[in-house]
Amino acid sequence: MTPSTLPIDQYDAQLAEKTGRLKAMMASYHAPEPQVFRSPVSHYRMRAEFRIWHDGDDLYHIMFDQQTKHRIRVDQFPVASELINRLMPALLNALRPHLTLRRKLFQIDYLSTMSNEIVVSLLYHKTLDDEWRQQAIALRDQLRQQGFNLQLIGRATKTKICLDHDYVDECLPVAGKQMVYRQVENSFTQPNAAMNIQMLEWALSVTEGSKGDLLELYCGNGNFSLALARNFERVLATEIAKPSVQAAQYNITANQIGNVQIIRMAAEEFTQAMRGVRQFNRLEGIDLASYRCDTIFVDPPRSGLDEETVRLVQEYPRILYISCNPETLCANLATLTQTHRVSQLALFDQFPYTHHMECGVLLEKRT
């Protein structure tokens, strides 16, 4: 695979290999057959980052070969959304005549949506001044006249210039409802929107008919919390990143959801609060004891759950666990399956043509 070509004819084979690998990893935990969710074979990634190479008055996107470290010119990138591919040449054509915008530009980041909004971040090794801002405004307006619903941001060391705002609003059809998600530049969002929809719908299906409340750790912008709210009486969710918390609060309002409460704190801190080890001012006005959470949802970073959080989640009758790293999931399952059994397993091909897998498990307490 190169940046400009995809081995689409090998898609089924690579998915079968991942399925077999996941089944082998999960065999010792007596997991059921996985449900397998396919990705679109191209234009599936909603964000992309490119370094910029300057050649005299010309410039172009590049990536680096992971083995040889050689640079590769990238004019089209079929991994990324069609919107990103349309904007890539249009943006460079608009940049070339403007030395102020070109000079010391070393990276361009794109974040697109299925709702055809896109935010572009231009990263520089220089100070950004008023002249840069004026030319950036002209660049933004020129691209908008070409039909791009675009937000433009300039970044340099300790500097962020946002011409309008630094987010896009995604709209996803999830199990018969349109869900609005504000996605903030430089914050985590699910990269494969089509797979995100399938993950949300799978999570809804395996929690259908739930009783009581839901606790979510690592909620981000509320991606899962808000979709799952329809299956629970109340949802209590934690997130540490301030921009993600702000986006989640907006998303609660935009989706007119009244049963979700977001708390800004780390999962480790929340564990301490639940155990009564520490008191936090951030929890003032929130009666943790009033929640009857029979289900806990976790979508941790690649490192998985720390030991203390594993012990916390074991206290809940049902654990819904989304993992972007099955190896750390299995490490956690070695402990979790002492008290719970794996009742559902899913493979989401979030990262086609790569070694990486995303999977989901539902664990239910042994009787």
From Swiss-Prot:
Per the UniProt entry, the Enzyme Commission number(s) are 2.1.1.-, 2.1.1.35
Which species? Musicola paradisiaca (strain Ech703)
Q: What does this protein do?
A: Dual-specificity methyltransferase that catalyzes the formation of 5-methyluridine at position 54 (m5U54) in all tRNAs, and that of position 341 (m5U341) in tmRNA (transfer-mRNA).
What top-level branch of life does the organism fall under?
Answer: Bacteria
Protein's name in the database: tRNA/tmRNA (uracil-C(5))-methyltransferase
Biological process annotations from GO: tRNA methylation
Q: Which gene encodes it?
A: trmA
In terms of Pfam families, this protein maps to: tRNA_U5-meth_tr
UniProt GO MF annotations: rRNA binding; tRNA (uracil(54)-C5)-methyltransferase activity, S-adenosyl methionine-dependent; tRNA binding
Q: Which family does it belong to?
A: Belongs to the class I-like SAM-binding methyltransferase superfamily. RNA M5U methyltransferase family. TrmA subfamily.
